[in-house]
Amino acid sequence: MSNANGNSNGKQNNDLEDLQSLNLLLSNSNNNNNNNNNNNNNNNNNNNNNNNNNNKNNNNNNSNISSNGNINYTESQTFKEHPIGLPKPVQEFVTKLMTHRNNLIETNAIDKPFLIPPSKEVVDLFKTYKKSMNDANGIQDEDQDDTDDEFALLPDDHYDEELILDEDYQDGNDENDTNNSNNANTTTRNNTTTAIQNNALTIPNSSSSSSYNLIEAIGNLNNNNTLGTTTTTTTTTTTTTSLPDLNLNFDSSELFKKFKNDNHQNHDSNINNNNKILNDGLDVTNLLKINKEYQEFIKKYLQKIEEEQKRNKEMLAQARKSIHVTIGPRTIKGGGFRKKGIAKEQLDNSDSDNGGGGNGGGFDDEYVNCSCIGTCICIDSNGQPLFKRKKPGIPYFSFEVEVDGVIQTHYPADNPDSENIRITKNNMPLYFKTRRWTKKESELLLKGIKEKNLQKKLYRLSEDKLSKAEYEKKLKQIQRSSNNNNNNNNNINNNNNNNSIKDKQDFVAPTMQVISQVCVESLTRSPLEAYLRWKNHDDPSINKGPFTKEEDKKLLTLAKKYDGHEWEKISIELGTNRTPLACIQRYQRSLNSKMMKREWTKEEDEVLAGVIKLHMHGERIDWQEITEYIPGRTGHQCLHRWHKTLDPSIKKGRWSPEEDQCLINAVNAYGKGNWILIKNHVKGRTDVQCRERYCNVLDPQLTKIRWTPQEDKRLFDITNKVGIGKWSDVAKLMENRTDNQCWRRWKQLNKSSNVLKDYQEKVSKKKEICVSNFSGRKHERSELTVDDVIEIEEKLNPKSNKKTKTLTSTTTTSTNPTTNNNKTDNIDNQCGKNNDCSTFCGIDDHYDDELLQKD
């Protein structure tokens, strides 16, 4: 806000708003007057004589002014544009002023000055007109300074737009308050005017509602030229302006109260001046005084704000002076030195004894060396450090110790919360938004990488300085190689086919950038997903064929060497283009005997039965959910254990003749081998029970007579040829004997020899070191024998392991085996003699729980 004696152009905007606000106040007052005229017809009729007298006096005054001042008066056709009685030059000036203001509003240039300085002629006419009107009404000019000012028509000082009168008080539109006050103690004033009936000063509307302080005489003239008698009610409105807490709270109601009381006290003596009183009980002179009071108050308020701002600037300047700004060590480029952690001033004064003086000052040992980057604020204006070095001790979070040239970082011990968090995070997957790769996506990835590598080849070929013949020759080779790769994209199954791997040069080692380009062009996968997919599955150089016996043997050796870790190294040393993931899967599922359990315990059977009852939904069972309750068991193991052994609907014990007949009829209908379909016709029996019953008892091709010496000799020959333990192969060569018959006969013939004892030890050892439970995944069974596993253990631990007698294809020493014709095997009801048929119906077809080895 500018001062009172400031630039006139800078204070003109708010003054027009004052003029417009007064117009709004007068318009509202006239509206209320019209309403009050309708309600107070009796009072108006009583005062008609006074009004007529006043009209005559006013007309005489106007004629006197015209004759004495030589002023030509022109009544405007529309009073809303100019008040009646103003000289024509003044009216033209006001019209010009309003037109200029409207143009600024339309061009959105409100911030520019809008008032035009009046000419000397207009000022003189207005002064004469004002003096004549005041003399006619008996009013003395209170502010003579304004009449001497050539800008008397212009507004006074600026004021804050926020400090405005209450809207209800200015507008006077609260009819309820007006009616209530009319019924209470009210003061009736008769405003007698002479020139105009039911007209008021109208100025272009404005959004501002501040008090009026422009063209004081126009307002007085308007009041003097208002025709009719109106009865107004004086109400007390309290307006308190809230300002920031600087002990300058201002209550405008005190000013209003003061001026209103003065008007009431002087009402009887100044009855002739009632035409100056507005409908709200305040005349224009009092409003101007209130405006000046506001201006004085705002000036004080702004002065105090400026003082506070100046004080803040001084305090900020003092604070900046107290901090010595130094260029940090990493920004020092001159002087030919650079030392980490020490500023330039410190280096210049590092030899000082007391650590003070100069611009920078040296530091004592008790202070911390500055290690700031950029600007340093660690030293004061005297060059002394602001912070002292801490006493030596162990840091709270971590500390480093150098041992044998190696820096070791030590951290505090984990609390229970950090341990739980670490366990939880270790079990969380690295990537959550996973979805299965489709065949089309894999083909697009393969095609994209091939095209990118082909582009590289062609670019390198174009960069080589070759003759035309050499260029065409190499180009044909590249095209031929590309066509061959299109025909053999997925034919690499093992590492033995080295030539086929070399032909896959179009797919060798794509970078992350290449895969990112492929994803942008053809895939909806992220580059990381595509990279992992390529490295672990889609790369044609990956060996996806079945593991050979040599691979299993070498893999088992490397896994024991690295103690089940370092699978990347294991995959490289294996040398068969297997991925680390494929190596660990093969070891854990087929070679690690400690990974999966073999025999079911009674406790496991009880847990399995209870969990199935809890999680069975009709006939559907989620076996992967069941495995969470039984550690060390797979879903297939739980499924087979339940359906083959623990299901309460399974019958156990001797077979009845009716069951045998149903089994024979089903075998004749479906054929030998379709045991899944056959079991549906034998209620309560499993497929394994049906197979064992038919193959060992009911098969008409079986020979149930005693073993002859010729059969015994043939059994020994076949066993020596095939190997001990492969009883299924032995039974096939014997033709009319089952595997179980062959095993039991061989056991009976060698019960007194060491061969049987060695074989039993071998079977026991196999249970410990070999994986034998492959239910539902027979294709994962390894070809390694127990002898191979024992050989590997002896190579890795030759001293700790005792020498184990390796049993190979054991042969008997007796050429004439002892036969006991009096002792024959009665196998008519083998399954019936054992109440628990599960021993003969195991997952791995182990007909003898301890000794029988099934291939």
Curated annotation (Swiss-Prot):
| Signal peptide positions on this chain | none
Task: Look up the record and report any one GO term of the cellular component aspect.
Answer: nucleus
Q: Where is the composition biased (Low complexity)?
A: 178-190, 483-499, 806-824
UniProt keyword Plastid present: no
User: What residue stretches are annotated with the Myb-like domain?
Assistant: 596-646
Coiled-coil annotation: which residues? 291-324
One biological process term from GO is: snRNA transcription by RNA polymerase II
UniProt GO molecular function: RNA polymerase III type 3 promoter sequence-specific DNA binding
PANTHER family on file: SNRNA-ACTIVATING PROTEIN COMPLEX SUBUNIT 4 (PTHR46621:SF1)
What is the protein name given in its UniProt record?
Myb-like protein L
Q: What is the lineage of its organism?
A: Eukaryota, Amoebozoa, Evosea, Eumycetozoa, Dictyostelia
